[in-house]
Amino acid sequence: MKYIRDLARVDDNVMSVSPQIRKENRPFVGIVVICDNKKYCVPLTSPKPKHMSMKNDKDFSRMFDKDNKLIGCLNFNNMIPVDDSVLLPIDMEVHKSDSIGEQAYKALLNDQLDWCNDNLEAITSKACKLYKIVAETPDKMKNLTRRCCDFKNLEQVLEKRKNSK
């Protein structure tokens, strides 16, 4: 979580895990893609009522299960650079000792993972196109760039972290 806070210090578009706004327990869960030979984590978000009226765009995708029920979204605009040192696997297996809430969360994560696996090529393509727009031609689509993380700036934070170890 320290890495996420380091990123958030240099870019307000990074999804917060700050204790000041009661987000310290929010997991940063996402799908890892490779853009420009760099690993990026595209954050997943749980379904919210506002997502029903939102349309898929260059920086946003809704995920639906086989019954066409909204199961979550991918926020490409909030993707962050990662390396193996900041990635942790998630135990998505349902255990008897899991609470009802944990079981529901793991079921949701499994549904989201199924959707992501079924749409992996489109996810990677969308992430890389967005990366290229924001990192290489930010003036081309200013409104889009404004709501996205500054990928190049965040890459410097990751590089600094790597060099300090």
Task: Name what the model sees in each region.
Residues 63-165:
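C-terminal terminal-subdomain/extension
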Residues 1-25:
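Short N-terminal edge-element motif at the start of the domain
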Residues 25-27, 76:
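Extracellular structured ligand-interaction cores
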